[in-house]
Each structure stands twice: as structure tokens, then as C-alpha cells.
Amino acid sequence: MTSLTLALDAMGGDHGPHVTVPAALRALKSHSSLKIILVGDKTEIDVYLRQAEQPLLSRIEVIHTDEVVSMSDRPVHALRTRKNSSMRLSIELVRDGRAAACVSAGNTGALMAMAKVLLKTLPGVDRPALVSCLPSVTQKPVYLLDLGANISCDSETLFQFAVMGSVLCEAVDKKSRPKVALLNVGTEEIKGNDQVQQAAQILQNTDQINYTGFIEGDEIYSGNVDVIVCDGFVGNITLKTSEGIAKLLVHQLKRGLTQGFFVRFLAKLIAPRIQAVLSQMNPDHYNGASLIGLRGIVVKSHGNADETAYLQAINLAVTEAQRRLPEMIKDRLESILLDINN
């Protein structure tokens, strides 16, 4: 790939440089043309850079700041007072063109507030959305948005989310005309609140979006659609519930496989297959939520992500930057709005 620079909020998340720096080094090993700017406390960052190979260090820049957005900071407070924080400086690097994307595991509300103010939304986009991919029984990813950036949404906003989600799926998975559905309490046309009903009418009249209708909660993981759209209140609860169920299933499976000698013996025989299944159910495998609809790329990692999970978020940022996701969304939205207005 051509040279690409990412900005990492090295201090964000529960583990800070203990996770972000080793993950950055692993990303550099995987992407030979990648450069990374680590933003945070240089003294803490350097601890994890001491043993790094020189060729990797030559592709790392450290910008020092000892100010951090805490997980307890309210978004407005962080926006007004944390002007030299590692999170804000990382976003500013994207705004100023020094980085193609930024990744942070920090305070979600603060990240969204700073990103919206500093990067601005794309033309035709009222609000950015938080989107992530989920597993499915067909083993293809399913994109769900919004995941909490917007608690309530009108029909126009849901329509914009559908467009952005469709373009994201095309860009990341290179899928032609991905199937888009609205999450609803039923599949019948009469079901749903006014916002969902009106959004459905707009999408039905938009030829450039492959809208398939409503989808219920029990079909989210079926793999029958590629993009599922809802407001942030519903999306966040759906995501957190899914993660909780996944953890429960993993726990129950591990517990069941340790009860009794014969069961333990069989478990050892099929250990690789069991590990593969557990990996697919692990939420860390899908770490990285994109804040789309902005004039720059911002990827949010889980706050408690380990090194491997954080690496997933970095890889997602690389992919979106390579595909020039904001430009793709802008062009597609302009084309669709032109068709609608004509």
C-alpha cells in the first residue's frame, strides 16, 4: 500500500500504553508502509518502545502530552477543558491532514463530541453514526448502526445512516449492492413508529440503496442482510446485550467441557475446533466501531480491549483510510440526493 499515517490516542482506554503501544508495533510489522503517531505521555510510551526493532521505531513519532480525557469526563466538559489531551490532539492530526485516521479507546461521548466539532460532518449528513460489525451464521459480517451516537433519530437521519452503512460495507468488504434493512418490532409494513415507517418509505423510493425491508431482533445474526439500521438507543442496547450473551455462552461452554473425565478427554481431541468457535463468539474479534459521516476517519476501540483487540481497531482504520471512506460516502450521498431531488 502507499504510505499511510495513523494517529493513536496512546493514553485512551483502561490500559493505556500497556496495550496501545504493543498493538501499534504489531500493526507496523503487518503494514510495511504504515507510519504511526503516538500521542500521550512520552515517558510512559517510551517504556514500551525500548525493546522495539529500529526499523519499526523509524516509522513511529511520539507527540508528548500529559493531559488525558478520563472515562468520567462529561463530553461537553472534555470538549471545553481538555484542549491538550491525547484524544483531542489525535483528532486534530486528522483535521490538519497529518494523519489519515485516528484510533482511540477513550471516553466514547468525549470522542464523538470532539470529532464532530473538530472534523465536521460531510455535506448532506446531519449527524455522524457509530457503526460496528457483528458475526452471523453465514460467517459474513453484519454492520449495525447507530450504536449510541444518537439516542433518538428522525426518518431523514435513519435514511442517511442507511446510505452510510451501505457505502461502508461496499468499501470495507468490497460488496456490491449490500442488503440494507431497518430494525423493527415486526416485518409487516404496518409495524414500527413514525420515524421507522417514514424512513422505510424514503428507502423504498431510493434505487441506489438495496433496501430489503424490516428485520426483527432474532434475525440480526442470520446473515440475510448486510447492514441493519436503527437509532442509537436501540443499537446500543442491542450491541451490549449481544456481547453479554456471547460472554455467557463462552462461559457455559467452557464450564460444560470441564465436567467429567470423558468430556474433558473429548474436549482435548477437538480443542482446535472449540477454540475456533470461541474465537468467533469473542466480542474482541470484532473490536473497532467507526464514527462515520465525518470529514475524517475516527475508530473507537473498546475501553477494555487487549493488545489483539486494539490491533483489530487499528487494522479497521487502515482499511477505511485506504478505501477513502469519507470521500466514498460524500460522493454516494450527493448522487442519491440528486436523484431524489430530480
Swiss-Prot record:
Function per UniProt: Catalyzes the reversible formation of acyl-phosphate (acyl-PO(4)) from acyl-[acyl-carrier-protein] (acyl-ACP). This enzyme utilizes acyl-ACP as fatty acyl donor, but not acyl-CoA.
Entry GO MF terms: phosphate:acyl-[acyl carrier protein] acyltransferase activity
Catalytic activity field: a fatty acyl-[ACP] + phosphate = an acyl phosphate + holo-[ACP]
Principal location: cytoplasm
Keyword match Magnesium: no
GO cellular component: cytoplasm
Protein name: Phosphate acyltransferase
EC number of the protein: 2.3.1.274
Classification via InterPro entries: FA_synthesis (IPR003664), Phospholipid_synth_PlsX-like (IPR012281)
Keywords attached to this entry: Cytoplasm, Lipid biosynthesis, Lipid metabolism, Phospholipid biosynthesis, Phospholipid metabolism, Transferase
Species lineage: Bacteria, Pseudomonadati, Pseudomonadota, Gammaproteobacteria, Alteromonadales
Compartments (UniProt record): Cytoplasm
Any matching Pfam family: FA_synthesis
Transmembrane segments: none
GO BP terms: fatty acid biosynthetic process; phospholipid biosynthetic process
